[in-house]
Amino acid sequence: MSDAFPEMTVGAGTVLTTDQAQKAVWCGAQFIVSPGLNPKVVSWCIDRNIPVIPGIATPTELEAALDLGLTTVKFFPAEAFGGLKTLKAISAPYGNVRFMPTGGIHPENLNNYLSFLKIFACGGSWMVP
């Protein structure tokens, strides 16, 4: 895809292992997104200068991401964990962290999420039926 559309930034999502990350990058992925925080995947990406956005749902997981040097994370599954209200509460002590919520995001709640300044993007399967 990245060869066919060189102006497009292409990433790989739902990456669970370093083997999957390696294959995705070999296929042209320029960044990696994971549903959870796998330190091996994060370290593999950091060691290769590949942007990585792992999933977190709790302050403990966010602290682990910060310990790995990350300041950009995915909040997943957003709606199942309380949505924007929970994200605002979790993010309050972490002024330098930016979030990409996914999971339960849809056209009706998208603008509410995007109005929160700590959110840089939202994801959802509804975007690609």
Task: Enumerate the predicted regions with their spans.
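Catalytic beta/alpha-barrel core
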Residues: 8-16, 29-37, 51-58, 62, ...
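Glycine-enriched alpha-helix->loop->beta-strand junction motifs that scaffold or abut catalytic
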Residues: 4-8, 26-32, 47-53, 67-72, ...
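Glycine-rich beta-strand-to-loop/alpha-helix junction loops that act as flexible
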Residues: 12-13, 101-105, 122-126
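Catalytic cores of alpha/beta
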Residues: 17-27, 60-68, 85, 91-92, ...
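Glycine-rich phosphate-binding active-site loops on the catalytic face of alpha/beta enzymes
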Residues: 31, 35-41, 74-84, 118-129
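Short, glycine/charged-rich beta-strand-loop motifs at protein surfaces that mediate ligand recognition
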Residues: 76-77, 97-104, 109
